[in-house]
Regions:
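Generic structural signal for well-ordered alpha-helical scaffold segments
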Residues: 1, 82-86, 159-160
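Aromatic-rich peripheral "rim/lid" segments of glycoside hydrolase catalytic domains that contact
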Residues: 3-6, 12-38, 43, 47, ...
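Aromatic- and acid-rich polysaccharide-binding/catalytic face
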Residues: 9, 15, 50-61, 78-108, ...
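Surface-exposed cleft-lining segments at the edges of enzyme active sites
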Residues: 25-35, 63-70, 94-108
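Loop-centered beta-sheet repeat module
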Residues: 39, 55-63, 71-73
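Short, compositionally biased strand/turn segments
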Residues: 66-76, 145-150
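Sparse, context-dependent recognition of short Cys/His-centered cofactor- or disulfide-binding micro-motifs
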Residues: 75, 80-82, 113, 156
Length: 222
């Protein structure tokens, strides 16, 4: 940050701070927590604001997209953290939702739950950025056309909710081409994952079309 400061228009100041059931405050154990206690987050944002007076300063978190017990608890803990930071006057501007979608969890995706969470975050005066969008496949042994359709449908369902909320200001995919997707080594099972807009030869897939339609609709209705 000392080098780039406000050249970057947003900063991920604190990444993935929440982990349920470990520490009493719901924070993830880390060297920062060990050194400074739970207020390390406050200190991080205050220092970041001094280095970047006009940039957007964000918390970034994963695993908060589905109606599953562990994700429901994580959303609640995250919302409590955001409320606490706002009450303390901490210079936080928003929340990054990583949105690493998982086709194995699609039966547990509830539009209303995501919409309510976005409303709760927005009501705190915070922005939301979809920061790491991609899709983990459940069954890469299916025909490619079926796989691509499932990925596109999952992204479409998610963006229909996210982009309808005024707090959501941007969407960033966690890569462009399947060739370089982290999910190709972390996938389930291992192998080339088709969860990004372009295939391994950089040809657009149905997910790219869904993104184009979603953004075009957003701008047309602005």
């Amino acid at each position: 940050m000392p080098r780039y400061g406000d050249v970057a228009f947003t900063w991920d100041v604190v990444n993935e701070p929440i982990e349920a059931g470990v520490l009493p405050d719901g924070l993830r154990p880390s060297p920062y927590h060990q050194a400074f206690g739970p207020d390390y987050i406050v200190r991080a944002f205050e220092d970041a604001r001094m280095l970047a007076p006009t940039a957007g300063l964000f918390v970034n978190e994963f695993g908060i997209d589905h109606d599953l017990p562990e994700e429901n608890e994580k959303r609640l803990l995250l919302l409590r953290l955001l409320e606490k930071l706002k009450k303390k006057g901490v210079p936080i501007d928003g929340l990054g939702i990583q949105a690493h979608l998982d086709l194995a969890k699609q039966p547990y995706f509830r539009e209303a739950i995501l919409a309510d969470f976005l409303n709760d975050v927005g009501s705190l005066g915070l922005q939301v950025r979809i920061s790491e969008l991609d899709v983990r496949e459940a069954n890469p042994l299916q025909p490619v056309a079926d796989r691509d359709t499932q990925v596109a449908q999952a992204v479409g369902r998610y963006l229909d909710v996210a982009l309808a909320n005024r707090a959501v200001g941007s969407v960033t995919c966690w890569g462009l081409s399947d060739r370089y997707s982290w999910l190709s080594s972390w996938g389930r099972p291992a192998g080339l994952n088709r969860g990004l807009p372009l295939d391994s030869d950089f040809n657009p897939k149905p997910m790219a079309n869904v993104l184009n339609i979603a953004f075009a609709s957003l701008f047309n209705n602005a």
